[in-house]
Amino acid sequence: MNAYTVSRLALDAGVSVHIVRDYLLRGLLRPVACTTGGYGLFDDAALQRLCFVRAAFEAGIGLGALARLCRALDAANCDETAAQLAVLRQFVERRREALANLEVQLAAMPTAPAQHAESLP
């Protein structure tokens, strides 16, 4: 098992230490052990979770929804985990539809300034 400090976890995930500490306060991450000095230690699963949470957040999923999923995972509550995953999948599907619609709109945009001026009322 790799043991990560907060700073090493942040470095390996490509985020700041402040983000890791914020996620700890929100319950998105939990240390698996503590040093004698009281510092949290994290494992590979924590690194994987941090990378997932960050990717989901960057995709537009709120930290509240991610915290609900993490709480369900930490409690080993299969029903709640499944429910939270379903919510996230619905969000992803809606986001895909919105992006597809945006792509259609972008394709219809005039590319030359003269075309744009002619299309204005």
Swiss-Prot record:
<feature type="domain" description="HTH merR-type">
    <location>
        <begin position="3"/>
        <end position="72"/>
    </location>
</feature>
<keyword id="KW-0614">Plasmid</keyword>
<dbReference type="GO" id="GO:0003677">
    <property type="term" value="F:DNA binding"/>
</dbReference>
<keyword id="KW-0805">Transcription regulation</keyword>
<dbReference type="GO" id="GO:0003700">
    <property type="term" value="F:DNA-binding transcription factor activity"/>
</dbReference>
<dbReference type="InterPro" id="IPR009061">
    <property type="entry name" value="DNA-bd_dom_put_sf"/>
</dbReference>
<keyword id="KW-0238">DNA-binding</keyword>
<dbReference type="InterPro" id="IPR047057">
    <property type="entry name" value="MerR_fam"/>
</dbReference>
<keyword id="KW-0475">Mercuric resistance</keyword>
<dbReference type="GO" id="GO:0045892">
    <property type="term" value="P:negative regulation of DNA-templated transcription"/>
</dbReference>
<keyword id="KW-0804">Transcription</keyword>
<dbReference type="GO" id="GO:0046689">
    <property type="term" value="P:response to mercury ion"/>
</dbReference>
<dbReference type="Pfam" id="PF13411">
    <property type="entry name" value="MerR_1"/>
</dbReference>
<feature type="DNA-binding region" description="H-T-H motif">
    <location>
        <begin position="6"/>
        <end position="25"/>
    </location>
</feature>
<protein>
    <recommendedName>
        <fullName>HTH-type transcriptional regulator MerD</fullName>
    </recommendedName>
</protein>
<dbReference type="InterPro" id="IPR011797">
    <property type="entry name" value="MerD"/>
</dbReference>
<dbReference type="InterPro" id="IPR000551">
    <property type="entry name" value="MerR-type_HTH_dom"/>
</dbReference>
